[in-house]
Amino acid sequence: RFEAGLLDERDWRPSVWVGFPGAWSGAARYYQARFTAPAQVAKSRLYLSGLGWFEAFVNGKRLGDAVLDPAPTDYSQSVLYRVFDLAGLLVPGENVLAIHAGGGWHVQPIVRVQLELDGELVAKTRPFGPPSGPSGIRRNSIYGGEEFDARLEPDSTWMLPSGPILPPGRSCCRIAPPAGRMRAAMTPAVRELMELPVRSWNRLADGRFVADFGQNFAGYCRLKLTAPAGTQVSLRFAEYCNADGSVNQENLLGEEALDVYTARGDAAGEVWKPRFTYHGFRFVEVAGLPGEPGADTLTGIVVGSDCPPIGRFRTDNELLNRIDAMVAWTERSNLHGVPTDCPQRTERMGWLNDMMARNECAIFHFDEATLLRKWLRDIAEAQDPETGFVPMTAPNHWTPDKVDPVCSSFVETAWNLHLFFGERALLRELFPNFLAWCRCMEQATENQILTDGGEIGDWVPPLEFCGRNTCRSGLVPQELVATALYGYAVSLTAKIAAFLGEKDEEKRLADQLAAIRAAFHARFYRGEGKYESESQSAYSFALRCGMVPEELAGLVSQRLVERFEADKCKLTTGNIGTKYLLEALSECGRADLIFKMVNSTEYPGWGYMLANGATTLWERWELATGGGMNSHNHPMLGSVGGWFYRYLAGIRPLPDSDGFDRFELAPSFVAGLNEVEASYDSFAGKIVSHWKREAGKVAWEFTIPANSKARVSLPGDAARTFGPGTHRITV
């Protein structure tokens, strides 16, 4: 049965936003609302938003299992609310709604409530009320951590109908509302996804202890202890340690990831975990424990958007398996209402540049469709309505001076949601935004060439190939990268126009694309299949962005092969260039060269990261510590995870796919691998590709779900179409 939420601001009146004016102390706040319920209630709906984050209780029972809720947005554009069904929680007569609000991305905790029983408004936030008081959380910050004093936490009886008014009984007041429109949260909630035990403890010379969880992840810790009242235990979080074993927080860029718990002195023991912060870490330095840590003193809790795994990949090569696990852990660590760049330092933003390299890998591993729909709307809200300019992050925290086509992940991610998940309505909704973005880029060109090259380019190649005092590639011209991506965005928008039946726009975009390709070829082609700089990135961007004339594609691909072999099969590319390098070499039949690179622990590469202790992807190809750009949990170099599925297993949607109803199966039987097995829970059903060497031949078994068909391609053989079922081929 369909039910609409509160769709218009008028539906919320007379409910208002309440909080406390003035400077915020950093403390979390409790809010209490008492209301009367009849003996019989057929339908109960609580509409609730708390910024930055909230948790709610009715008669002492927690509503839902979401944490760090709601997801961040640009509060001047949208404010998300949750809807709760209170069935089974209400009692006849007086009831208590309790809300716990922390700063989150809004910083100042504010709440808005509307409760309806059988369609009648029975509780709301009023200009003066409800009663409010401080919780035991004395300080909470996304970046800085949380400080909790258990001695100051109010007795929970105030959450019960028989309990007292929330001490100290002070009423909050009406607060100027955020300008954004109230919208129901349609994105997966952030939840506690799993628990991790401490792998080992290290005692430092000064008596502090360092816990090693053996895995870098995003979340927080649960602390268990028995201690006298006033005992203060601090938890300091980091991704790596100093030579003396203490944690190193230099890469957090100035913020101290510190949780502090002050015990109330309960002889039966105390258990605590934070409510309104999270960290990216592997190591925790613990100070103030009254004794030696026990087996359950500290437990790691993995926290993130609840996007279930939908891809599984396995080979007989343990290094490749570990690389895929590293990629998956990194992606899982960076889903927090938006796809973030990192979970640990003072950033944690939805960078469009990162998503340009990451989005296919992400949706092969996790069902991120709903999360990415929300994020694409965040981008649309951040886009300049007059110029079509798209900023680097969404929700927007940083607007560059230049137009940069790396932000065309806005278009590509939407198109991939169509190919992978059958998304149609969003393409229609955002099509005007894509057109505006293409116009914006065109206006920044000189004769279809983006001469200023944008801000980012091919970001963070190996250090020796970076430009002077920059993380951009010094091997490939910025304007080549920017113009190729501009053309790619126009080509995708033309495909969307064709799918939507927008014939006039399709024709106009096709003409624009032809002009870009001609200008690109005239500006950067040097003859004999060579492009300016003759670098891996130059060839890869030209090929994968569709800038190479069809009659030259084979020759240019051969030049890329020669370049890569001359570079001893070591990459010289940045985040996007690496993705395109993997694809371009595989498309011309040289997946063997990519396998040679991936199956290595030498620098630069993913195996090198693992050989140097990584459990999640680094931001740089180098092992870096200290301040600066050196996150150790950063998904933008993870495109190899998509390559495993697309080329080793050979599972990839066709250009005319609509939710994987049509796809290609074209595995690469590379020498040195004896078995590859991958499955993907597609929108159409489960797809499996499993090949294994047996007695000098390759036995390949693949499964096509119902109502789908696959084009099966093998080297040296004409493509054939297969329908649903499990099929076996021996090569």
Where do the protein language model's features map onto the residues?
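Active-site-adjacent structural elements in folded domains
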Residues: 30, 81-83, 269-270, 341-346, ...
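Well-ordered alpha-helical segments within folded domains of soluble proteins
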Residues: 351-363, 372-373, 404-416, 479-494, ...
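Active-site acid/base region of carbohydrate-active enzymes
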Residues: 53, 110, 121-127, 131-133, ...
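Extracellular/oxidizing-compartment recognition motifs
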Residues: 3-345, 353-354, 370-371, 387-398, ...
